[in-house]
């Protein structure tokens, strides 16, 4: 799916008029075009399904070091910074830090690909819970491992700048698949690494 930049421009112009402003005044003349260009960038992930993102970043390596040596060995990354926009208010979700873990099953994925997946999934109209679920699904497809965990901490503009207006409020979500959800040893190890 391609993003319709021209339609966005027209609608932003209409929003400016609906707000009671003049889209032809000096400060706003190019605003519809700038907003459309920004949306094309920040919503790039909407152009791709989870399957397409999995295909895009499907660069793996054989993992002959930990095949059945220790079934609790995991790959863990944290502090991956992303942003997103909530689908309810189009408000920015910011200061988002993602932690991702998986237990390799003969294949490992390049570390930069993990961060790229998180970034691409965030570039959609989203819910924080769905970001975690989408990342987990994509990693499962690429690595062949059922054992994937995603922990996300973030702030939501819809909580901090409107409505209840509680700046500094953080939302933490977890997506635990496979043994991260069923094996206390694995989940305890994950939490130890996350809080370290």
Curated annotation (Swiss-Prot):
GO terms for cellular component: cytoplasm. The keyword Kinase does not apply. One of its GO terms (biological process) is tetrahydrofolate biosynthetic process. It comes from the Bacteria. Transmembrane segments: none annotated. One of its GO terms (molecular function) is GTP cyclohydrolase I activity. Keywords: GTP-binding, Hydrolase, Metal-binding, Nucleotide-binding, One-carbon metabolism, Zinc. Zn(2+) binds at residues 86, 89, 158. It holds the Pfam family GTP_cyclohydroI. It catalyses: GTP + H2O = 7,8-dihydroneopterin 3'-triphosphate + formate + H(+). It is an enzyme of class 3 (hydrolase). Pathway: Cofactor biosynthesis; 7,8-dihydroneopterin triphosphate biosynthesis; 7,8-dihydroneopterin triphosphate from GTP: step 1/1. InterPro entries: GTP-CH-I_C/QueF, GTP-CH-I_N, GTP_CycHdrlase_I, GTP_CycHdrlase_I_CS, GTP_CycHdrlase_I_dom. Its EC number is 3.5.4.16. Homomer. Belongs to the GTP cyclohydrolase I family. This is GTP cyclohydrolase 1. It comes from Clostridium botulinum (strain Kyoto / Type A2). The lineage of its organism: Bacteria, Bacillati, Bacillota, Clostridia, Eubacteriales.
């Amino acid at each position: 799916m391609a993003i319709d930049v021209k339609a966005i421009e027209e609608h932003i112009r209409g929003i400016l008029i609906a707000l009671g402003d003049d889209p032809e005044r000096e400060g706003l003349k190019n605003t519809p075009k700038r907003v459309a260009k920004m949306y094309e960038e920040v919503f790039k992930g909407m152009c791709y399904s989870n399957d397409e993102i999995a295909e895009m970043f499907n660069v793996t390596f054989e993992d002959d070091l930990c095949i059945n040596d220790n079934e609790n060995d995991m790959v863990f990354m944290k502090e991956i910074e992303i942003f997103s926009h909530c689908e309810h208010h189009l408000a920015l979700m910011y200061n988002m830090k993602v932690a991702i873990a998986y237990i390799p099953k003969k294949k490992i994925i390049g570390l930069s690909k993990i961060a790229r997946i998180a970034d691409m999934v965030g570039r959609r109209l989203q819910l924080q819970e769905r970001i975690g679920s989408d990342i987990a699904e994509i990693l499962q497809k690429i690595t062949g491992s059922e054992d994937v965990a995603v922990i996300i901490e973030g702030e939501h503009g819809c909580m901090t700048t409107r409505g209840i207006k509680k700046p500094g409020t953080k939302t933490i979500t977890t997506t635990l698949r496979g043994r991260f959800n069923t094996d206390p040893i694995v989940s305890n190890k994950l939490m130890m690494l996350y809080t370290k």
